[in-house]
């Protein structure tokens, strides 16, 4: 078996336009395609993260809220590798996105921090 890369990650959002604005205009991902699927009554937005990875956004009517405390099984957070955590945090803050203080990962010794998407999904920056 050769699982060589992560092709895509799919998340469900409560507000399509807010999620699209966040991931495209604030994080800079490019739109591959977007479709309204009337049979499912939802939007599907495919975004290019980099040459190897895509992010799928599904916007459904009234999805249940994300469980943060206590944490539930499933995706805990989504982490993005960056060259400079400080520079990326600066750019995010200039876009109105709050970030936690930068800290050093106890295991890797690398700088990292967290912020959240509009639905509260924790997103990590890691050098």
Please report, for each region that a protein language model flagged, where it lies by residue:
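Short amphipathic alpha-helices within nucleic acid-binding modules
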Residues: 22, 86-91
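N-terminal beta-strand motif that seeds the catalytic metal site of vicinal oxygen chelate
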Residues: 1-18, 75-78
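Core segments of cupin and vicinal oxygen chelate
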Residues: 12-54
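Mid-chain, well-packed structural core segment of small domains
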Residues: 71-86
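Exposed loop/turn and edge beta-strand positions of beta-sandwich/beta-sheet ligand-binding modules
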Residues: 41, 74, 109
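A short, acidic/glycine-rich surface segment
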Residues: 32-34, 41-43, 62-68, 101
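Short, charged/polar surface micro-motifs in flexible loops or helix N-caps
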Residues: 50-54, 62-63, 85-86
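Vicinal oxygen chelate
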Residues: 1-2, 35, 46-48, 89-127
């Amino acid at each position: 078996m050769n699982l060589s890369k992560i092709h895509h990650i799919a998340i469900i959002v409560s507000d399509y336009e807010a999620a699209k604005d966040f991931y495209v205009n604030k994080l800079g991902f490019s739109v591959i395609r977007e479709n309204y699927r009337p049979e499912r009554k939802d939007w599907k937005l495919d975004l290019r993260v980099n040459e190897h990875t895509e992010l799928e956004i599904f916007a459904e009517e009234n999805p249940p809220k994300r469980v943060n405390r206590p944490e539930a099984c499933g995706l805990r957070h989504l982490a993005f590798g960056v060259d400079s955590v400080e520079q990326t945090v600066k750019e995010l803050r200039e876009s109105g996105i709050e970030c936690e203080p930068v800290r050093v990962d106890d295991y890797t010794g690398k700088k990292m921090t967290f912020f959240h998407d509009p639905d509260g999904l924790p997103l990590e920056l890691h050098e």
